[in-house]
Amino acid sequence: MELLTNNLKFITDPFVCRLRHLSPTPSEEHMKNKNNVTEFILLGLTQNPEGQKVLFVTFLLIYMVTIMGNLLIIVTIMASQSLGSPMYFFLASLSFIDTVYSTAFAPKMIVDLLSEKKTISFQGCMAQLFMDHLFAGAEVILLVVMAYDRYMAICKPLHELITMNRRVCVLMLLAAWIGGFLHSLVQFLFIYQLPFCGPNVIDNFLCDLYPLLKLACTNTYVTGLSMIANGGAICAVTFFTILLSYGVILHSLKTQSLEGKRKAFYTCASHVTVVILFFVPCIFLYARPNSTFPIDKSMTVVLTFITPMLNPLIYTLKNAEMKSAMRKLWSKKVSLAGKWLYHS
C-alpha cells in the first residue's frame, strides 16, 4: 500500500506542480491586473485640429508670460534692498512656486497639442499627480502665511519686526513645503495602491485624482471620501479662514490714517484676488463627491495656467514699491549694458 502511494505521488507531483504554475494565486492575479495599464491616453482640451493649433499658440504665450513675470519678481526682490520685508520674501517664494507649478504641466500639454499620440506612462502620470498636489499644497499653506504676515503688519506693526524675523520667515516657508509634501504623499498613496486594469483614457490634459479614480477597477467610494477630507475640506476651511482674517484686518483699518488705509487696502485687495483665483477652482475640483464634470478642464486650466500668470500682474499693478524697484533695477541694467557696448 505504501509502495502504491509513493508511486501515485511520483506520478501526480509533476502534474500538480504544473497546475500550480499555470494557475496564479489571487494575489498574483491581482498584481497582474494591477499592472495591465502601463500608460494613459490624454484627450486634452479639444479634439479639433484647428482648435489645437490655436490653443498651442495661446498656452505657449501664457507659459512664456508666466515664466518671465514670476522670474522678474524673484530677481527684483532678491536684487533690491528696499524689498527686504517679510511680505516680499513670501511674494518671491510664491512666484517660485508658480514658476515650478506651471512648468510641471505646461511643456507636455503644449507639446501634446501638436502631437497625434497624447499618452503618458503610468510612472509619469503618478509623478504628475504628486507634483500637482505638492506645489498646490505648498501654495495653500503659503497663502495662509502671507495672510498672517499682513495681519501682523497692519494690526500689530510694532510686533512684526520682532515676530516676523528672517529665521521665522524661513521656518514658515519650510513648513509650507513640508505640509505640501505630506498632503501630496497621502493623495499619491491613495491612488498608487489602486488597481488599473483598463480602460486607460483620461478626459483631461493631465493626470488628476477624480479621472484616475474613475478608471480604477475597484470600489473607490472610501478612497474618494478620504481624498475629499485631505484635499477639498482643507481648501474650503483654509479659504474661509483667510477671508475671515482679512475681514479682521479691514475692520482694524478704522484707526489708520488715510494713506495707511489706502496702502493696506491695495495690499489686501491684491492678496484676496490671488486667494479667490486659486481657492475657487481648488474647492470646486476637490471638495465634492467622486465625480467628473465637463467644466473640470476649465477649472484645471485656471488653477495651473491662469493663476500663475496673473499673480505677478496682480501683485505689481498697484504696488508702488515693486514698480519703483523694477524701474531702478532695470534702468541700472540697461545703463550698464549701454556702457559695456560703448567701451567694446
Curated annotation (Swiss-Prot):
Biological source species: Homo sapiens
Name of the coding gene: OR4A15
InterPro entries referenced in this protein's UniProt entry, alphabetically: GPCR_Rhodpsn, GPCR_Rhodpsn_7TM, Olfact_rcpt, Olfactory_Receptors
GO CC field: plasma membrane
Assigned keywords, A-Z: Cell membrane, Disulfide bond, G-protein coupled receptor, Glycoprotein, Membrane, Olfaction, Receptor, Sensory transduction, Transducer, Transmembrane, Transmembrane helix
Membrane topology: Multi-pass membrane protein
Main location: membrane
Glycosylation sites: 36, 290
Disulfide pattern: 125-217
Record's protein name: Olfactory receptor 4A15
Side Cytoplasmic, residues: 78-85, 149-167, 248-263, 318-344
